[in-house]
Amino acid sequence: MRDLKTYLXVAPV
């Protein structure tokens, strides 16, 4: 699930 980590990482919150 690399997409999830990328999203979190990108999430400003």
Swiss-Prot record:
Transmembrane intervals: 7-13
Gene Ontology BP annotations: photosynthesis
Keyword field: Chloroplast, Membrane, Photosynthesis, Photosystem I, Plastid, Thylakoid, Transmembrane, Transmembrane helix
Main location: plastid
Lipid bilayer topology: Single-pass membrane protein
Protein family (similarity comment): Belongs to the PsaJ family.
Its biological purpose: May help in the organization of the PsaE and PsaF subunits.
Protein name: Photosystem I reaction center subunit IX
Name of encoding gene: psaJ
